[in-house]
């Protein structure tokens, strides 16, 4: 045996908590404490093995250093195929690293010395689930799973083929879990914790097989780690830190019956780490000795807090070798080379030691074929042989399940082939660019250097940056491995503002397609666009050209796009004035800050046709010429309303108990002593324009009182559609308008609603509304009118019937200071109102009631954690009205789940309730794609958590009756989707868990019977 303690392997005096040798033996990794962070270092193995390589300066010793962990790294482990490195630390994270093929070394960031990263390793995935320090990680024998344990008392099983998917979370320990080891045949995983127990879990169903406590009753939680190990033949599990007659031991646990009759004794302090040699040995046959085959045996290394290392052979009663005082502090980790003749040991004192054995000392190692034969003869064949994330050692009971697995295997093979074909051109392109090698490119770049001469004749070369060239093997960007579904709705909201056409009159300019700001510059003053939007061309107080007015209609677009971040402009278009405005919360807050700007006083304008006064809801309404002097007086008193406003409000038919701030530009609910609701109404403008769709050639123009016939003034409506134009004349001034590709509707002063077809044909006689219009919207062939009396109506113009008739908002606006911040009419005619308290309601015509579909303060959304059930990151994100209503809430809820520590049962219940709410809300909104999206996530969660009863109920509802019956009330479709087609999509999810193979088979067979019929 040879012993070496290389001084060049160190963490600058900081502790090294873990070490692991790469399967190919060319490198090894260490993990521990760095400078203000955790540190993972990959070292070159040849300088450790040969003295001449250590002295050769051309052979690098350090290959790469990664300081991405925010806190100390407790464990590093290579995958069995050597492609990945997993590291876990005190920052509660597990990072999975993969080599990236950069050319040339790079300096270690932040290093004062000239350290260079010869190899480039990038973070492939970051696994977040633990709420405490990660103490140990372990790859399954065939790299299908990655297990991690933590001081949060849990063990998490990750799907190594589909990070960051969680297969299962093992709960049962009542103390800090400090060590993990896999059964070499893949049937069990064992964990050791400070609760004086080792628990063995079945990988078949991730349930507890046995709990071993007796050898650990006298133990205390004095060790930093408890690294236990399973023998390569699978017969023995050896624990760390056990006690026998008050003496520290390493307990030997037999697989057969989990008996604890033997142990490794001799260490003076607690055992911290046990590591079996990966090879199975047999005694070396000497020349002339008996040809009788010897019994195979295993080799085990034991490290302790007494700073000593012992190496044992299971065929001997005493240790093969004991090395005392090998380090200054406790031994933390041990790793064997793949050939079984070398061993690396690390210590808390920040150093490592390498022991090199010979075959004469350990014996002849068995070949891999002989080792597999031992496994097969002892345990039989196992599903663990496959790389599928299935449950090993589970009997497949029927051919349908077997066929399903084979189809999945073929599908994955096809995906890998396509991926390989896509990566091949990348590698070729990286190695050769335009026929030149990368080295030629570098030389050509150096030839292009810029050289100048200074005044004194000296040369000066301008520095030229030569970027690193990646030869491929790209990996996911750092901190970007968790899908954020909430980002898409947010981006859609911000991108929809280009679907607006700005109101025009003779002195205004047009703007369409560009992204508008909420604030426009007028002269030298900065004012909100809405503030200057409604000034008429005849306003004598305006010294600069009138700014474009932000008035648009509700175009016919997808329901999810109907609510966007520029909803203020859209709703003002439907109401005909900036007086009725709907802002998202961000815009509201921005406008609140400008509450003291000029011309921000509330204006109350008396209607010329109705006796009901208008309630102020904007910073400035349309001005008449005679009011210019009054405006100058108002600017001197910025905190008080005009006397005229006070007089008009005092004679209002409803006695106002509260009026919301007019700077908030929201639909304001005014509560009264008689509980009568009043919503703000728009004031007629001289002219305005609104766009019908994203096509800028489709828009309508409104001009009030442009013609005089017999002493009566008429208003004109013009519609421009695909190069064609039609006109309509109305006898009253138009106060609000809305339109889509199918329908154009306008509301006039005399409470009349006129509806026209896309070609200009009047569909109905003027509809008399019960009170003046407050908000008018149109989507497809549906028209929604919200009146000043807080009554909502929705008509189906195509079928000429009413869907919702004068439904009161009283149940929604019963609280104080509640306002309507957003409105939405889906493409199926479902109205949705979003209130200032963050709650959103929709009205169901079938139930004749309001339903809560979203709540920003919902604790379920904040605590639910269903990330492992989300579609992959490259999947098309779900879009629809529910996603737009909730906006970024769902993303915030998933991120907040990491900040809350709660019992698993509580989190499971909250996640279940949240997903069921999402499915029900999508169904209420009649959003078919969102219903399918959330149903699949819900089903995946049921499969992951093992809720068979609810899963069966979902499947039964989708399957329906197998035999036809005249009195059956079952509907074969839901929201236009075939239920049995949805069931076909659910079955592959169910098939992922072999515990549900009978459920899978049951419904698969019934679908086959129905198909044959």
Curated annotation (Swiss-Prot):
Its main location: nucleus. It comes from the Eukaryota. InterPro entries: CAF1B_HIR1_beta-prop, HIR1-like, HIRA-like_C, WD40/YVTN_repeat-like_dom_sf, WD40_repeat_dom_sf, WD40_rpt. It is found in: Nucleus. CDD domains: WD40. The keyword Transferase does not apply. Residues 535-553, 573-587 have a biased composition (Polar residues). GO terms for cellular component: chromatin; HIR complex; nucleus. Keywords: Chromatin regulator, Nucleus, Repeat, Repressor, Transcription, Transcription regulation, WD repeat. Residues 529-648 are annotated as: Disordered. One of its GO terms (molecular function) is nucleosome binding. WD repeats lie at residues 11-53, 68-107, 129-168, 172-211, 220-263, 266-322, 326-367. PROSITE patterns: WD_REPEATS_1, WD_REPEATS_2, WD_REPEATS_REGION. Gene3D superfamilies: YVTN repeat-like/Quinoprotein amine dehydrogenase (2.130.10.10). Residues 558-572, 589-604, 624-634 have a biased composition (Basic and acidic residues). One of its GO terms (biological process) is regulation of DNA-templated transcription. Belongs to the WD repeat HIR1 family. Required for the periodic repression of histone gene transcription during the cell cycle. Required for replication-independent chromatin assembly. PANTHER family: MEMBER OF THE HIR1 FAMILY OF WD-REPEAT PROTEINS, PROTEIN HIRA. Interacts with histone H2A, histone H2B, histone H3 and histone H4. This is Protein HIRA. It comes from Xenopus laevis.
